[in-house]
Amino acid sequence: MSIDRLAAFLADARQFRTIPIMRKFLADVIEPLQVFANLREEAVFLLESKDDESPWARYSFIGVAPFLTLESETGETFLIKDENGNVQMTASTLKEAFQAVERALCVKPLAEAAPFTGGAVGFLGYDFISAIEKVPRHRAPDLAMKAGHFVFCESLFAFDHEKRELSLIHYIRLKGHETMQEKIAIYRAAEERIAALAAKASRPRAEQPLLPAEDEAERAALFSKASSNYEKEQFLRDVEAVKQYIAAGDVFQAVLSQRFSVPVQAGGFAIYRILRHINPSPYMFYFRLDGIEIVGSSPEKLIQVRNRRAEIDPIAGTRRRGRSPAEDEKLADELYHDPKERAEHYMLVDLARNDIGRVAKYGTVEVPVLMEIGKFSHVMHLISKVVGVLDDDIHPIDALLAAFPAGTVSGAPKVRAMQILQELEPTARGLYAGAIAYIGFDGSIDSCIAIRTAVIKDGYAYVQAGAGIVADSVPELEWKETRNKASALIYAIEQAERLFAKGEQIVC
């Protein structure tokens, strides 16, 4: 035990009740998947960036041993529970709940370069919108998903892939009345806990079955075991209904979606491992929360807040990557000059400007990047960047809710589009089109849209995908688009089931 570190802790303990201590390790021979598998009894989330072509793919995070949760069934009241599930406090909003936790914990700030060093991690379901906008609750919330669920973890593993460095951050929690000897004992126990976690995390990786190669024939039969919440003919009729609303001037666009359910025996971690291989994305995540598993590979940021600067990166327009540099450039040029893609993208940039404008200081909203080609491992998109500086009386959570949900999964204007979708879609969306997010003690937020996401619950995996309906949409093509968007996750589920059937279970 370092005397200097102990002295620093004792000094901090005079001012703070929750004190982070951090140890750094070289991460040249371990990686996030291995660490999560080794800590599977206590780990509750894994956040990764798994696209080497993406500028966002630098950090990954693993949360261990949650000690507080923020939960809400409808978004109108949040319960703050301890690690035993006992309600400690209640709050009427997410912001009030987070601020109550901050006051109770009295956390010492941590000077560290990583964008997230501790705080709340979890999700807001799409149906949370009914608590903050004039959007009626859906008539059929059949999955009974919480509107919001966040965890605060005692220990956090933060990978910096650029530096090949791992930071292990452990939060010591004091009650405020400990004696000097008790504080020293608590600090020693924390040092031992860090050493034990580091040793466990770095164990050799358990033997894992080889992943099967992608099979085009299997891809063709993907949906044979999947059931939809929509009959095809009803979906086609609802596309026409949206077009009628567009013709009447209610909306410019609405994103109609369908949900697929697939029976599963394999665990969510097996599905996640396959998904990260076949569909790497800037935002990848795996959660185990309250009896459900969440697996996702989202390409799209919802909003990011760093040093009170908010950023939204609208994405619209997609092409596959070329098989050669020449084809890649040809496809990029085709995408950039496609008038329909450009029109949709401009609409989403306007939505982002409006969302940030609701919380930013006057005159600070800018579009430093407009309609550039962003290339990822498998696809390319039209990407813009909208930024603004938060007004002085705005909390970062206000910015998160101003952007929620994204226009790319709802429509424009957003509120009217969502009202129409609640009327037409046969079941509540649950997590789909909501947000996966972290909210740092330092006021930082990063979040992605909950698309390309599966919820595993009660023996079924649920995957939902939507298509943006506009005035000239062809119903049959929109039906196909929803299936195409769901195909990577359905394929990952099918492959995990094949391994399970062979008895080749993936550890975790």
Curated annotation (Swiss-Prot):
Its EC number is 4.1.3.27. One of its GO terms (biological process) is L-tryptophan biosynthetic process. Binds 1 Mg(2+) ion per subunit. L-tryptophan binds at residues 49, 282-284. Its cofactor is Mg(2+). Chorismate binds at residues 317-318, 432, 452, 466-468. Gene3D superfamilies: Anthranilate synthase (3.60.120.10). NCBIfam families: trpE_most. Part of a heterotetrameric complex that catalyzes the two-step biosynthesis of anthranilate, an intermediate in the biosynthesis of L-tryptophan. In the first step, the glutamine-binding beta subunit (TrpG) of anthranilate synthase (AS) provides the glutamine amidotransferase activity which generates ammonia as a substrate that, along with chorismate, is used in the second step, catalyzed by the large alpha subunit of AS (TrpE) to produce anthranilate. In the absence of TrpG, TrpE can synthesize anthranilate directly from chorismate and high concentrations of ammonia. This is Anthranilate synthase component 1. It comes from Geobacillus stearothermophilus. The gene is trpE.
